[in-house]
Design a protein with these regions (language model features):
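Alpha-helical scaffold elements lining the catalytic groove of polysaccharide deacetylases
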Residues: 215-223, 694-701, 705
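M16 family metallopeptidases and their MPP-like homologs
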Residues: 58-60, 65-82, 88-90, 107-156, ...
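Bacterial N-terminal signal peptides that target proteins for export
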Residues: 1-9
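Flexible, low-complexity linker/tail segments at the boundary of structured domains
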Residues: 231, 713-714
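Bacterial N-terminal signal peptides
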Residues: 10-18
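Active-site His/Glu-centered metal-binding helix of metallohydrolases
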Residues: 89-97, 323, 582
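Proteolytic maturation boundary segments
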Residues: 21-58, 245-309, 313, 317-318, ...
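Hydrophobic, small-residue-rich alpha-helical packing segments that form membrane-like cores
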Residues: 167, 172-180, 184-235, 239-241, ...
């Protein structure tokens, strides 16, 4: 499972730097002890083969989750292969494979899969990109018939699509709705800058969604021709990973795919280049509906990308990973500085839209007036590396972080879910990504990471950054009175930064531990074991409770959460309004005198995270850790209770980033609609603060928020802590005694307070106009006061699932009027008893009234006729399959245990879920529909501006 460059980037922890001199050696001059010819081995645990007709397959037996197989049909063909009359048809073909095949006519395929618990969208799915189309099918494997049908389905996708004229025309509306959803500011700006980003390439004219004209008017033969030309064995792979023996899966593949014939004169599968250019292309795009300002700098490689084949290639990818780790640590430190130059920024070397070209890319999101400053910062930081290189301290920390992530993957190598494994096999087929297996990779990292020199990493910058093949893209809002950045300003900045002599980065030493004074340990005063749930609850000497569950679901994971009732519900209305937008910035100050950048340095090589929060009805603290870093987690928890820093500069940095992020959110039509509907539903509440804005962020009261935080976290004895994962019980009890029982306990036993305000009820319709694109959306809400009953809550949730099935059938498949539609229902008992049932869908303005009536008609059918047994059985089967998997997930247990106490429910009900599902009947669901879906409802409609 080779860590990709983006995976290395995403896993980066923020660090600071230390200084040494820059070595000027180039990468070519560096000698490696490993062979430049020795090939990267192939994972021996994976069965890879090729049928006589050219189809490739990958198989692995994997028992997590049990009784399930993940199937993928991978087609090495996407929109780049479309001819002019086929633009958008690679993606259209993906749709058609769900709408009629030889063995599953019309909607029978989705109907069958739903009947065995496979949910359309959430489980069953597919995607199309420039160079590939991938079909995703998880299938239950406890029944041989279900497994057989799963293979029949992917075989049908490969060569048995019916593609009748009627089916094609029926699907046009759905695909056009998906096309409509993609319209907006980002799409308009992208269409303008793509010719520069993808200069001279066919990629610029082959976005997978296609063109409206082709989608509306293409001849049936155009689609059939694409299917015939590109859906063929030599361009396909089947991936099968799951809880079935390899021999059985291999035989299934041979039986279903061995008979597919290759065409006699197959069209060559070309690859398409991204030509080099000497010029620097600059694209500056703005739009009045743009929500964010962004800056991108790309340095496209001169040479075409080559897959990693040898040990030397693999080692070089490790060098690139270290470079990405360190440059992003620097950018993250700047993000945390006073007057930050961007909301966030990152850099990495990786792929572009084109299969054959990679690039070094630096990116930042910034304020609407900060584009030049953000661009300057990105250019300077790259130039700083070029002039001075990285330094020894940050290099060592980067190696620790990368090795910690690799070690985590290695420890959990036998606990990885099948749906996380298949992606690597897909990339191996499409991109020739090596897949030697995590055991080999872990050993290789242990062997080679210490041998990588700082000189090797520093040499990369000269390869990455050149004036040719450079593209700079600025996108952002357009509004009256705002001066746009010009191309001349960008060129001037490029020349200026290139001439600057910059100071090297400075590193400041930090302490070994964040705990400076070890707290005096408390004691455990009571143990309670729940054999039914497999949990133990400790009562500590300060009154705090600790519930933990030892699991073997993951070897290197412990999850944690804690709460105490109260939150800002105990504030006055004025205090709530003054602090609500400040609370998120409190932890930015760090703890115990260490700022956030120093903390990140001290946490190098550790897998640990802790997040405190003051919510509306509770104060919470949550996180996760590797078992080896559990003490660090406990130390952080202790410090967030006792020693949160107060730092005006850090808080000011947080406010500036939030203002930059929020500054133009109201320009987005969908966001505007959500905000205005919120005001319509809740605007009369004295505690309703609405959507945060730059003006509201300026009014956030840091002093008051800090004071209130201290009050809310002053009594640890009122908290209940939860831990789930690979726990050493003796260690956890000792750590809880040392770091939790030692916290102040006052015996307060607080409860949240509930205001008298309730959302708007009754029969209402609100129409909100915003935006220029012909896009509308509809929300229908049934809600009001009730008496909470767990059985009714579950029934209303189930009605939402059933109604979603019916709405997809009616609004999408029959009417062709929507791409996505859904319904959700629940009854809550916190902060007060209240039911809510929501329906939402986007559509064309011309279809709003028709589809609204159609949706309400489906609701009425549930009231007058009740759901069918067939639809109820579909939902029940999905519930059962999902629950079976959840019962072996740490995250499920953490959430379930906490919520049982938080919502004051019986935790033992966790074990009664299956009987609860089996007890659902159509008669009872109809009664619930009559009770909750027969009355008033509120309709919100978003339309474009007239």
């Amino acid at each position: 499972m080779k860590l990709s460059k983006m995976q290395l980037l995403v896993g980066i922890c923020t660090l600071m730097l230390s200084g040494t001199s820059l070595a000027q050696e180039t990468k070519e001059a560096i000698k490696s002890e490993i062979s430049s010819e020795e090939k990267i081995p192939f994972n021996p645990e994976v069965k890879m083969g090729k049928l006589a007709n050219g189809l490739t397959y990958y198989i692995k037996n994997n028992g997590k989750p049990e009784d399930k197989v993940e199937l993928r049909l991978v087609v090495n063909a996407g929109s780049i292969l479309e001819e002019d009359d086929q633009r958008g048809l690679a993606h259209f073909m993906e749709h058609m494979n769900f709408n009629g095949t030889k063995n599953f006519e019309k909607n029978e395929l989705v109907d069958y899969l739903q009947s065995i618990g496979v949910k359309f969208g959430a489980h069953l799915n597919a995607y199309t990109s420039f160079d590939e189309t991938v079909y995703i099918l998880p299938i239950p494997s406890d029944d041989p018939e279900k497994l057989e049908k799963g293979f029949q389905i992917i075989e049908d996708w490969a060569h048995n699509a019916l593609l009748t004229g009627e089916q094609i025309d029926d699907e046009r509306g759905v695909v056009l709705e998906e096309y409509r959803l993609g319209q907006g500011a980002d799409e308009r700006m992208m269409q303008n800058y793509l010719p520069k980003l993808l200069y001279g390439s066919k990629y610029a004219d082959r976005l997978p969604i296609g063109t409206k004209d082709v989608l509306e008017n293409f001849e049936y033969d155009s689609l059939k021709r694409f299917y015939k030309d590109w859906y063929r064995p030599d361009l396909m792979a089947v991936v099968a990973v799951g809880d079935v023996d390899v021999a059985t899966l291999e035989q299934k593949i041979k039986d279903h795919f061995g008979g597919i014939e290759m065409p006699k004169d197959p069209k060559p599968r070309k690859t398409f280049d991204l030509p080099n250019h000497k010029e620097t292309f600059i694209a500056i795009e703005s739009d009045k509906e743009a929500s964010f300002s962004q800056v991108q700098v790309l340095f496209k490689d001169k040479e075409d990308a080559q897959p990693d084949h040898t040990l030397k290639d693999y080692r070089e990818s490790m060098v690139e990973g270290l470079f990405s780790q360190m440059i992003n640590n620097r950018l993250d430190e700047l993000r945390n500085s006073p007057n930050p130059p961007f909301v966030y920024g990152f850099s990495y070397h990786g792929g572009t839209y084109a299969k054959t070209k990679e690039a070094y890319r630096s990116f930042a999101m910034t304020s609407e007036t900060g584009q030049l400053k953000a661009l300057e910062t990105l250019l300077e930081e790259n130039q700083r590396v070029k002039q001075h290189g990285f330094f020894e301290g940050e290099f060592e920390r980067a190696k620790k972080d990368i090795m910690a992530r690799m070690e985590k993957s290695y420890k959990d190598k036998d606990k990885m879910e099948s749906n996380r494994i298949v992606g690597e096999y897909v990339r191996h087929y499409l991109e020739n990504e090596p897949m030697p297996g995590i055991s080999w990779e872990y050993d290789f990292y242990k062997q080679q990471l210490p041998t990588i020199s700082l000189k090797e990493v520093n040499a990369l910058i000269s390869d990455y950054i050149k004036e040719e093949n450079r593209v700079i893209i600025l996108t952002g809002p357009e509004k009256e009175g705002m001066t746009q950045v010009t191309e001349a300003e960008v060129k001037s900045l490029l020349d200026d930064v290139n001439k600057r002599t910059l100071e090297p980065y400075e590193d400041k030493a930090v302490a070994e531990s964040m705990i400076t004074d070890m707290p005096t340990a408390g004691t455990v005063t009571d143990y309670k074991v729940n054999d039914k749930l497999g949990t133990t609850t400790l009562t500590l000497s300060n009154g705090a409770k600790v519930t933990y569950k030892v699991t073997d679901f993951k070897n290197d994971e412990i999850l944690f959460d804690a709460f105490s009732y109260g939150g800002s519900s105990l504030y006055t209305d004025e205090e709530h309004i003054a602090t609500v937008n400040a609370n998120g910035g409190l932890s930015e100050a760090g703890v115990n005198g260490f700022d956030i950048n120093e903390m990140n340095k001290m946490l190098s090589g550790k897998i640990v995270n802790v997040r405190p929060r003051v919510g509306t009805y509770s104060e919470d603290i949550s996180g996760n850790a590797s078992p080896k870093d559990l003490e660090t987690l406990f130390q952080l928890v202790h410090l967030y209770f006792t020693s949160l820093n107060k730092n005006e500069e850090a808080f000011g940095s947080y406010i500036e980033k939030q203002k930059s992020f929020l500054g133009n959110m109201m320009s987005n039509p969908q966001t505007y609609f959500s905000i205005k509907m919120g005001e319509f539903m809740y605007g009369d509440s004295p505690r309703y603060t609405g959507f945060p804005t730059p003006e509201k962020m300026d009014e956030a009261d840091y002093d008051l928020a800090y004071k209130k935080y201290q009050e809310r976290f002053a009594d640890a004895g009122d908290f209940h802590f939860y831990f789930v994962g690979n726990i050493n019980e003796k260690e956890l009890v000792e750590l809880a005694s040392q770091y939790l029982a030692s916290l102040p306990g006052k015996g307060s036993n607080e409860m949240y307070e509930v205001s008298d305000f309730r959302p708007l009820t009754g029969q209402h319709e609100k129409i909100i106009e915003k935006g220029e694109d012909p896009k509308s959306s509809v929300r229908i809400t049934y809600h009001g006061p009730t008496e909470y009953k767990a059985k009714e809550d579950f029934a209303l949730e189930t009605l939402g699932e059933i109604l979603t099935i019916k709405l997809v059938e009616q609004l999408r498949e029959e009417e062709g009027g929507v791409y996505g539609v859904g319904a959700r229902g629940n009854i809550s008992n916190m902060p007060y008893d209240w039911y809510s049932f929501n329906i939402s869908f986007p559509c064309g303005p011309e279809n709003v009234e028709k589809l609204k009536k159609a949706a309400l008609a489906e609701v009425q059918k549930l009231v007058t006729d009740g759901p069918t047994q067939k639809d109820l059985d579909k939902v029940k089967e999905t519930y059962m399959l999902d629950h079976k998997e959840e019962m072996k997930e740490n995250r499920f247990w953490l959430r379930a245990l906490k919520n049982a106490d938080y919502l004051q429910k019986d935790p033992n009900a966790i074990m009664e879920y299956e009987s609860k599902v089996k007890g659902l009947t159509t008669e009872y669901l109809q009664d619930i529909a009559k009770k909750y879906l027969s009355g008033d409802y509120i309709v919100g409609i978003h339309n474009p501006e007239s």
